[in-house]
């Protein structure tokens, strides 16, 4: 047998072997027949099929037995204010951060319960700063190829209306605050999707232009910065047309909780912040539970910030049983906290109740859903999706938490009068972040923040903007 024939036969064997392997890996008629028989052999499946076809899955899976555990009493609760409404926007992080600040202002100055800081005011600056963050990041990475993972991530995520607490802190420090009636909501701030799409499209176009400009021989950094400034003029115009221009000065009348006028004065955003929200954000620490990473270490997420020269999200990773006492200490001292979780899991929308036993999917579908918290995060099945204000805890006779309550920003008609109640078991499984003031944190944890953080990439499974 000559070499050519031998090579041909070997090649044919490889092809046949690969074909056989691929066939075995696909769904064969025999396999499909076996799958179908396993379903059809159980008579109850037909009844379930008919029931699910005409109803919502959650209505069928709802555990009526578990509803007896629903309870709205709380042993420790921070006095609540009028519930806010972020409407059809992803600004939960902003509403939550400002709710923490307004709670302090209302208590200090005896303001009406419906007092609010303007969310759209800070959102205007947020979108301008995020646009600059994206454009400057494109300049910084201009020498990297287009398929570089960081460059790819930037173009996939040029801007969003989501965010987190360090964004609130940086924006308030830089731009101040105004009351809600000094800059009111618009259709575009309440429904952000259209403007977000337009702005994202323009930023991607600008990003490509900056990369092309930076690739040309002789282009200086000063030229890139000048062009970026011109691009931000366009961004500013888009924002101003959608939201209006932020006020540089305004007159506002302070009223007491009964609505009686107390004082009328002129303010700038900075002077209004200094009077009504004079807080030191450096005393606010981010605590997180990410069981897939080593505990008692500080982590930082690259590009997880709102302002280019601001702060990335930086947190101390702790076990859940060590986070709860920090939150309890804060609530006992009438201090609300920025809190975020995976809000959609096992949520009874009608009651505003979060309980891992709300829905019995295992009995309905005849299979267990057995991933733990670590596995859910690793496989992108769970993560921090929504920020709210942690305001209450119900403790048992041993001072251990039974359930928690958060003030939401979906309006007062959602859930329990605008609040959500969560069992401690749900809290442990789906709570991820809480921001605690230093006076409620033991010194041993504060010292851990002095260590150099472990830098994580922005595409880490744990991190996405809270909406």
Where is each model-derived feature located?
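Long, positively charged binding patches that form subdomain-scale interaction surfaces
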Residues: 310-385
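N-terminal regions that are enriched for targeting/export leaders
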Residues: 26-82
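Active-site nucleophile-adjacent alpha helix/oxyanion-hole segment immediately C-terminal to the catalytic cysteine
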Residues: 69-321, 325-337, 414-416, 424, ...
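Conserved catalytic-core surface of thiol
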Residues: 396-467
């Amino acid at each position: 047998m000559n070499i050519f024939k031998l090579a041909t036969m070997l090649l044919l064997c490889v092809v046949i072997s690969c074909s056989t392997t691929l066939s075995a890996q696909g769904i064969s008629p025999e396999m499909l027949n076996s799958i179908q028989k396993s379903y059809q052999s159980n008579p109850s499946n037909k009844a379930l099929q008919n029931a699910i076809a005409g109803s919502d899955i959650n209505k069928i899976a709802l555990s009526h037995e578990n509803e007896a555990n629903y309870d709205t009493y709380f042993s420790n609760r921070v006095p609540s204010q009028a519930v806010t409404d972020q409407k059809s926007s992803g600004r939960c992080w902003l509403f939550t951060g400002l709710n923490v600040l307004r709670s302090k202002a209302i208590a200090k100055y005896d303001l009406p319960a419906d007092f609010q800081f303007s969310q759209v005011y800070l959102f205007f600056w947020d979108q301008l700063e995020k646009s600059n963050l994206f454009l400057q990041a494109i300049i910084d990475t201009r020498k990297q190829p287009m398929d570089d993972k960081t460059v790819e991530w930037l173009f996939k995520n040029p801007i969003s209306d989501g965010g987190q607490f360090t964004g609130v802190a940086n924006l308030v420090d830089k731009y101040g605050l105004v009351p809600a009636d000094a800059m009111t909501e618009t259709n575009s701030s309440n429904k952000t999707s259209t403007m977000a799409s337009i702005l994202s499209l323009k930023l991607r176009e600008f990003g490509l232009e900056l990369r092309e400009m930076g690739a040309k021989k002789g282009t200086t950094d000063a030229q890139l910065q000048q062009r970026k400034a011109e691009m931000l003029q366009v961004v500013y115009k888009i924002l101003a047309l959608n939201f209006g221009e932020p006020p540089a000065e305004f007159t506002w009348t302070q009223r007491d909780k009964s609505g009686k006028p107390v004082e009328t004065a002129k303010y700038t955003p900075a002077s209004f912040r200094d009077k009504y929200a004079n807080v030191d954000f450096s005393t606010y620490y981010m605590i997180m539970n990410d069981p897939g990473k080593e505990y008692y270490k500080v982590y930082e997420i690259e590009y997880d910030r709102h302002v280019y020269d601001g702060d990335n999200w930086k947190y101390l990773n702790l076990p859940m049983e060590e986070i709860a006492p920090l939150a309890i200490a804060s609530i006992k001292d009438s201090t609300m906290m920025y809190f975020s979780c995976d809000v959609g899991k096992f949520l009874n929308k009608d009651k505003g109740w979060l309980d891992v036993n709300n829905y019995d999917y295992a009995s309905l579908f005849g299979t267990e859903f057995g991933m733990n918290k670590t596995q859910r995060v690793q496989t992108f099945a769970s993560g921090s999706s929504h920020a709210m204000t942690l305001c209450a805890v119900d403790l048992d006779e041993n001072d251990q938490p039974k359930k928690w309550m958060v003030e939401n920003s979906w309006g007062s008609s959602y859930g329990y009068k605008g609040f959500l109640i969560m069992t401690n078991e749900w809290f442990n499984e789906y709570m991820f972040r809480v921001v605690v003031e230093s006076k409620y944190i033991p010194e041993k944890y504060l010292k851990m923040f002095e260590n150099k953080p472990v830098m994580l990439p922005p595409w880490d499974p744990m991190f996405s903007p809270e909406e």
